[in-house]
Amino acid sequence: MGGTSTDVSRYAGRYEHVMETTLDGVTIQSPQLDVNTVASGGSSCLFFRNGLFVVGPDSASAHPGPTCYRKGGPLAITDANLVTGRLAIEMFPRIFGPNENEGLDIHASLQAFEALTTHINAETGRTMSVDEVAQGFIRVANEVMCRPIRSLTQARGFSTSKHVLACFGGAGGQHACSIARALGIKTVVLHKYSSILSAFGMALADRVFEVQEPSNETWDHTPATLERIQTRADALAKRAQDELLAQGFARDRIHLEVYLHMRYDGTDTALMTLKPADSWNMESVFVDTYRQEFGFVLSNRAILIDDIRVRAVGRTFDSLGPSVLAEHAAQGTRYAHAKALDTASQRPVYFDGEGRLPTPIVRLKDLSAFEYVPGPAILIDETQTILVEPRCIAHILTQAVLIEIQYDEGRP
């Protein structure tokens, strides 16, 4: 979650790719990560229209920015987080205002919300407070961000509650707990560089080279057909491997994956099907994937192969250490209560259904690995704000913060 939009993708042991996408009516045929984007970010504008709270898609952008940027901008999600107490003004640089030498202006945000609240109450006949109005917009923004997550999980036959929510972007930590709870997710992970991880991650990422050829084969189980497919796949694999060898990767650091773009005859929905490591039993993989995504199979239809694709992955690192979940599991219950809480300053923060609660503000650099922080709390550093809501517990690990979401009996 950044300033203008939120990007969502799903990872289940491997990256999910699409071969084409449509943006603003234009179809782009190019392999890319399957990423859904919605207009909900820190600068998404807030409106009250036809009796409804509306967030986006208009954006205040970086200039003029939200109202609190001191440039006459409109109300935005950042203003809602500010007036509800979720942002630590003192941590923001003094780069706002006409001369870009001032801090955030919470008073401007409050005045704008007071005017909007008066308008909403007059139109609806209700007596909402500024906090309730601001929280209402935050709730709408969270729901907007939940939709693409449901599209990538529930709409494809996967239970959202069985996933971990990994959050990135400067605004992600402010909404992570609320979104996880709305989706029934029990665990949230935020890397210590989550707000700048696009740059950090590129330095650590594996390098990938793909080659593909169109095909008009029918998967008919005959040795001749399989031999033709294998021969073409082997040739593509050599091309892909040679490319990474030329880029300096050792042969033992290159991993090859073979895919067939398969579909049922008479349909236009092809699925990229990964070849199993120890066989060419592609039909069963395709059928299982099709059933998972659509809930049925067309057992009386022939299976066509639209193209053959080989992906070569050059490993940048053998290992980056234990995963966050593995480190948390190894630590078990041996977390210590965070000592920094004893001296932390507090401020009243508004929480949905709870009202204003005294909430400690703790700098991440003051927390040691394998300490825990019960919610409510705000964890901050120079690049991010993590809101730990009530009935949530933040566990500090060596490279990340892992938040456990607690539910009532019978909930996920």
Where are these regions (language model features)?
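Short secondary-structure junction motifs
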Residues: S5, T160-K162
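FAD-binding core of FAD-dependent oxidoreductases
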Residues: S5-D7, A39, S195-G201
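Residue-level signature of catalytic and energy-coupling elements of molecular machines
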Residues: M1, A39, L165, I179
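Early-domain small/polar-rich strand-loop-helix modules and first-structured segments
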Residues: Y11-R86
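C-terminal, non-catalytic interaction/recognition modules in large multi-subunit enzymes and RNPs
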Residues: N50-P64, L75-T160, C167-P412
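Gly/Thr-rich phosphate-binding beta-strand-loop-beta motif of the actin/hexokinase/Hsp70
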Residues: M1-A12, S44-F47, C177
